[in-house]
Design a protein with these regions (language model features):
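Ligand-binding clefts/hinges and TM-proximal coupling segments of bilobed small-molecule sensing domains
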Residues: 66, 143-160, 201-203, 233-265
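Periplasmic-binding protein-like
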Residues: 33-34, 111-118, 195-233, 255-265
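A ligand-binding cleft/hinge motif common to bilobed small-molecule-binding domains
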Residues: 76-79, 93-101, 149-150, 178-213
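Extracytoplasmic small-molecule ligand-binding "clamshell" domains
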Residues: 25-93, 101, 242, 251, ...
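Alpha-to-beta junction loops
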Residues: 64-66, 82-91, 134-135, 173-186, ...
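Extended ligand-binding regions for polar small-molecule ligands
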Residues: 53-62, 122, 130, 135, ...
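Acidic, polar ligand-binding/catalytic clefts
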Residues: 57, 66-130, 206-212
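Bilobed "Venus flytrap"/periplasmic-binding protein-like clamshell domains
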Residues: 29, 33-36, 48-61, 115-165, ...
Length: 265
């Protein structure tokens, strides 16, 4: 009987350990470690926060996933996902046909317009004709770079690429470029900063191009990782339904970022 009890207890312990391990599935969430307020920003202690961090963690909690933020440069996010350095990308990455050749995406979790900001002392709009002769800064390997090359290269003086959007913003403020294209919310945050207020203003939203800009931002997952994709999709629906999505969003925005406008990176 004693031997039987020991065996039973041992078996139960193994089963419990397996259950706990299963319930604490760790998922590495890839993001580019650059300031992209209000989506991602770093405090004085080095901790990352922002709307997208909060939404990512809410999705993970709803899906019962133990998520860990894993920094990788923007250019390395898709390669890192494919080589299993990370398990998903939640970094304002737009769902596009070109990216879907390499990775899969969850349903969208936000969608805002693409805009052009420029120097205050220059009057122009966000059209090819308006940007004629201008130097336009964009972040490399983003939908903004692809869009600018497709729609503005024939009229602009130069499409200048940067590793981060912040670098493009800094050059715009310094007068080294005439304009930059990015997500409207991110540009709005820059224009509300002391530096942005002093130098620049919004020139308008670019014309829609669903092929390049995509239908919105989703979580990137590896091709064939249907299980994680379905968990994330269910979690997005869950936090939209239970009010958590709106609760987080109201801390950062006074409008709906889930909307139907075209855009992000």
């Amino acid at each position: 009987m004693r031997t039987f009890l020991k065996t039973a207890v041992a078996a139960a312990a193994i089963a419990l350990a397996g259950t706990l391990a299963a319930s604490a599935e760790q998922v590495k969430v890839g993001f580019s470690p650059e300031a992209y307020p209000p989506f991602y920003s770093q405090d004085s202690s080095g901790k990352w926060g922002g709307w997208e961090v909060d939404i990512a963690m809410a999705i993970c909690a709803e899906a019962k996933l133990d998520c860990v933020l894993t920094p990788i440069p923007w250019d390395g996010l898709i390669p890192g996902l494919k080589t299993k350095k990370i398990d998903t990308i939640m970094n304002s990455m737009s769902i596009t046909a070109e990216r879907q050749k390499e990775i899969d995406f969850s349903d969208k979790y936000y969608n805002t317009p693409t805009s052009i900001a420029g120097a205050k002392d220059q009057k122009f709009d966000a059209s090819p004709e308006g940007l004629k002769g201008k130097v336009i800064g964009v972040q490399v390997s983003t939908i903004h770079a692809a869009y600018a090359k497709k729609h503005f290269a024939s009229t602009a003086a130069e499409i200048k690429e940067y590793q981060t959007q912040d670098e493009a913003n800094q050059d715009l403020a310094a007068g080294r470029i005439d304009a930059t294209q990015a997500d409207q919310i991110a540009l709005d945050a820059f224009l509300k900063s002391d530096q942005g207020k002093a130098c620049c203003d919004m020139k308008g939203n670019v014309a829609p191009d669903l092929e390049v800009l995509g239908p919105g931002v989703g979580a990137g997952v590896r091709k064939g990782d249907t299980e994680l994709k379905e968990k994330i999709n269910a979690a997005i629906k869950g936090i939209r339904a239970n009010g958590k999505y709106n609760e987080i969003t109201k801390k950062y925005f006074d409008f709906d970022v889930y909307g139907d406008a075209v855009q992000s990176n």
